[in-house]
Amino acid sequence: MTELPQAFLSQMAAQLKGEMAAFLRTYDDPYQRGLRVNPWKRPTRLPDDCGERVPWDENGHYLALTSTAGADVLHEAGAWYLQEPSAMLPAAVLNAQPGEHVLDLCAAPGGKSTQSGLRMGGQGVLVCNEPVWERAKILSQNIERMGIPNALVVSAYPDQLAQRWPEAFDCLLYTSDAADDKA
């Protein structure tokens, strides 16, 4: 099993209580790759190694571990976005709707933002924030590549956004990797 930091294990044990053993067993499961089809681009084909649909996203598919779908010209054209199936879950649960004002607080590289933008149907406002400027540039490229017309990419810290846009959003998406989780 993957060696995990003790602070993380303690935090998860407090949250999961009796489900901790089942949670730890998931680390023995094989790694999963996936892609999300961009229905706005209507690709004429999918990669040969594109598998079954991901149950929680109508555009998500499992992908072979050896796939080269990222080198395909259709990937560069925004016909699909490479994204782990588990990473598709937060935006699916958020289920942003057309006309809403949505803030993705830590948006890079853009998977959850593009997923939310597609769900919004190009209507409303999607603010995609990434405090680290270099990552914000990648985010901007992915938003453009996927053709999300109602997205605005910004690079600010959460307190700056709260001061500038208090109570401006209907919903907020926040996901953080362990390196960012210092709270």
Listing of model-derived features with the role each one plays in the protein:
Residues 1-168, 172:
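Glycine-rich nucleotide cofactor-binding entry segment
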